């Protein structure tokens, strides 16, 4: 067999001993914690032993070294055995394992990146393989390095569609540096898994998706060593037949034990039984990696030149996004773009044309696209920008919230926002996206209103930690800013003001331009308004909003192409709550819209220039 050298009996026994030590540690940790998933750990003990102490190449004292092989524990509830591995490797003190799930410990119930050996948070099932695909794509096509990527999945999560999106992606892009290990332990959380131990069906499914699929006895270290040696030339799925709770007498392969630690007396007895099978306490040292990953610096990536727009010219911010991203791509070869088969609408096709080797077509699989981006961003190897219609990011909200838990630095651009897209109708209109992205921890939400602001938003997003969302629009609107205008996160702009302003009007994107048009008509009636462009909806420029409100008799009017819930109006209301003498009035979309021309829809839903002018007059009259 090509490249496979069977380990000698001493090495095989050492791997068996390692697997049993991992079992013992998992049982001890979960019993001490009074919670956790020891049976899910025990089914994977031999897999983890062979992976980390025979197959993988890594520096055990430097888990995030860029040359290391990568590992993703997609079945994140088996975290105790991952922690046990790193204690076995000498990175964690063994005593720390007994602090599992304690508030004072970094060993959370599921893997999180405050642990140096965890690249992506897992635990919401079905997402690990997508992240692993992103790592493998980066290794093969961007780093062109020899590190390999391994992902351990449970059989229960194979019901998740996102797993099969990732399987398809790996096959399309020939990720021969990727190995998925399927821990087929038969039992789910509350019932047996749908296929139980029908290994041939698992194999046929993987093969149908273009993978090399190998069935093994998941408790045979020899079969596992052999299978990992065969993982070449195409993405490989090692389909391991295992038993949940392996090695735990009276519990192995029994239902109703998921997520239950062993009682102390029972744990002590089982640990003695397992310990008696260990022949040597000698530990296997990790094999170091081949050091061929390039040095990468993604800090302080700046546009090569200022924007080149002319005030008054018209451009849609979605197109300005594509132009800006392509331009930023010339500043760093680590800027990458991903799209969900909408590149001719989001205009990421401009990036593809100028940087074809750094564009990843993810097709219509938005959940996987976000996971791919998360994987690409790990260990600061790339700066990913994903784009699709903003409405379609709602499908990937779980992946986005897990990206935040992963402390991932990814940028998402959502186009076709609001009723202003027109005739395509409500299924295409993003009207919930601001609420969604504002709720994500440590997120930054950009809402640029012209081409200059959009270009600045792209540059800022590339250098901002966390999840960045850029909301772009379909209609063409006028350039209102000079090319040398300075933009910063959390810094709003006063677009129009006078000493006689009576109301502060806050709009963004399309509605900012409607507010400016309303100001023109109101001026003819000798009514002046102050118009603010927030630029970022999160964080919001509270100081400028308050200063403007106080200069306009405490009156604020927000207008947005978004539902009332969670958008600009609620963000502004939260910012000024408790401030005396300030009132906030909202104009927003109040029901599910319909098809129509953009101007007709803006008018129908009361967010056009006429509605703004009428609301301003109402506020003044009310006083």
Swiss-Prot record:
The modification Phosphotyrosine is found at residue 275. Thiamine diphosphate binds at residues 40, 77, 123-125, 156, 185, 244, 258, 392, 428. There is a cross-link at residue 352 (Glycyl lysine isopeptide (Lys-Gly) (interchain with G-Cter in SUMO2)). Substrate binds at residues 37, 258, 318, 345, 416, 424, 474. The modification Phosphoserine is found at residues 104, 295, 345. The record marks 37, 258 as: Important for catalytic activity. GO terms for biological process: pentose-phosphate shunt, non-oxidative branch. Belongs to the transketolase family. Homodimer. This is Transketolase. It comes from Macaca fascicularis (Crab-eating macaque). The gene is TKT.
